[in-house]
């Protein structure tokens, strides 16, 4: 697991966006795994800027989103399909037919989960998967106690996640308690995983992910098993790690080696 500690949230977004841009340059028909929530928005703004400046094109790219609320159709303003259209897809040259989000209004959500897994496999798997992290260590909607080998499935949201997301819904508006989410096993099959975290409220989750045991109590700790997992975090999110300067030293030395080798 690679840990990159940067000064602030803006630097985290730029660094993360650069990883995705380099991936697309290397493989124009890349399959991207995308995430919602407040943290990825700044990264998406960087991707939109790069597209407008002619530094990247998404014409051959396809994407799969991590999750969706069960019970919301794509036109609902709080659906993740709506979010992705507003925050990214409407502003770049990606073919929306090649952007998949789990169907929150599926008549048979269990069958829809199996079809989602099949679609990922048919595309050859995900090249780079973007993740955020919840205060309780959840990734996607894989809440604590989720199986570390789980696949795309219907999941019940914890009260903590429901409360965290309540700010996006009006007080009298229906708020889903169920979701469709890629499983942890699905995420781990991605060729590369990029997790973003900013703010002191994510510090406990980051410490558990990086320095804690591998455990279903912190779903993100499963990334310890991934050879190409990159955590990009700001100083605040890193504040509870045991030795921040050591992680910075590791990254500096690794970067020197990569620069010398021309990577």
From Swiss-Prot:
Catalysed reaction equations from the record: alpha-D-glucosamine 6-phosphate + H2O = beta-D-fructose 6-phosphate + NH4(+)
GO molecular function, one term: identical protein binding
Pathway: Amino-sugar metabolism; N-acetylneuraminate degradation; D-fructose 6-phosphate from N-acetylneuraminate: step 5/5
Catalytic-site annotation from UniProt: 67 (proton acceptor), 136 (for ring-opening step), 138 (proton acceptor), 143 (for ring-opening step)
Keyword set, alphabetical order: Carbohydrate metabolism, Hydrolase
GO cellular component terms, A-Z: cytoplasm
Annotated EC: 3.5.99.6
SUPFAM superfamilies per UniProt: NagB/RpiA/CoA transferase-like
Transmembrane regions listed in the UniProt entry: none
One Pfam family from the record: Glucosamine_iso
UniProt-listed GO biological process terms: carbohydrate metabolic process; glucosamine catabolic process; N-acetylglucosamine catabolic process; N-acetylneuraminate catabolic process
Taxonomic superkingdom: Bacteria
The family this protein is said to belong to: Belongs to the glucosamine/galactosamine-6-phosphate isomerase family. NagB subfamily.
Assembly and interaction partners: Homohexamer.
Annotated function: Catalyzes the reversible isomerization-deamination of glucosamine 6-phosphate (GlcN6P) to form fructose 6-phosphate (Fru6P) and ammonium ion.
This protein's name: Glucosamine-6-phosphate deaminase
Taxon lineage: Bacteria, Pseudomonadati, Pseudomonadota, Gammaproteobacteria, Cellvibrionales
